[in-house]
């Protein structure tokens, strides 16, 4: 979603309370990928972001709501007429004050990291939550895919095979971060098979616990072990992939800072 003014339209708890903004004009939104933890996101997790006072709700009233709520009008028209008229994004919308409109309002199946220190992470959207354009929206072509299968795909992405694939197709920047463009994101290879859906899914809680601790090598090892145990990949290959990951990440941080997994 492109609001044209994230600092104005995406609100935190303090601003919502200060202006007494009603919930009817607010929509949960992921403003930054760094706010997401684990491999799934839901209303419970989003509430924690809100309670931390991070920007987490999109203000998007329609005509009727703008007329109905004085508090919303007070906030909306705190922008000057010049700020409104000079914003090109505002001019593209039927109502400049309603960013949750048209294609921007489409809710993704998952969120993919965009600019990253380590490798990419796919977070499954378990609720009706949108995201800004600083986060990639992901949609599964197979609309009948099970939730368990989605989680398994998200976890498989954390394998040494997929993380190396991301390092190869992504673009390294001078700051050392890896940028995953939409085309690159589609090119990341992920290993999946019916027989590994349940074993991968069973790792969900453990994976999320390790992600909170930033134990990325341990995560790769857990996922790789499932792939190895089910004959998807060889242990010797995983060792080579892990070595390749370390070398490529060290290379993109060369001259910036020392890389530590």
Question: Language-model segments: which ranges?
Answer:
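Non-catalytic DNA-recognition/assembly elements of restriction-modification systems
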Residues: 1-5, 71, 194-261
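Polybasic, glycine- and aromatic-enriched phosphate-binding surface used to engage nucleic acids
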Residues: 1-202, 209
């Amino acid at each position: 979603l492109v609001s044209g003014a994230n600092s104005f339209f995406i609100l935190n708890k303090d601003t919502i309370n200060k202006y007494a903004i009603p919930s009817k004009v607010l929509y949960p939104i992921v403003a930054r990928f760094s706010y997401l933890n684990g491999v799934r996101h839901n209303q419970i997790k989003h509430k924690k972001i809100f309670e931390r006072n991070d920007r987490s709700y999109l203000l998007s009233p329609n005509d009727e709501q703008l007329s109905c709520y004085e508090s919303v009008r007070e906030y909306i028209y705190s922008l000057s007429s010049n700020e409104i008229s000079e914003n090109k994004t505002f001019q593209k919308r039927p109502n400049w004050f309603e960013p949750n409109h048209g294609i921007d309002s489409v809710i993704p199946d998952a969120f993919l990291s965009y600019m990253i220190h380590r490798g990419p992470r796919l977070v499954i959207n378990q609720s009706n939550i949108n995201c800004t354009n600083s986060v990639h929206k992901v949609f599964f072509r197979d609309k009948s895919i099970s939730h368990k299968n989605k989680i398994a795909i998200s976890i498989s992405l954390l394998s040494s095979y997929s993380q190396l694939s991301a390092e190869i197709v992504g673009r390294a920047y001078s700051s050392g971060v890896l940028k995953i463009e939409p085309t690159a994101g589609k090119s990341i290879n992920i290993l999946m098979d019916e027989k590994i859906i349940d074993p991968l899914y069973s790792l969900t809680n453990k994976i999320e616990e390790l992600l909170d601790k930033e134990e990325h090598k341990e995560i790769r090892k857990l996922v790789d072990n499932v792939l190895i145990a089910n004959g998807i990949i060889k242990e010797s290959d995983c060792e080579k992939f892990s070595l390749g990951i370390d070398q490529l990440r060290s290379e993109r941080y060369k001259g910036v800072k020392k890389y530590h997994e």
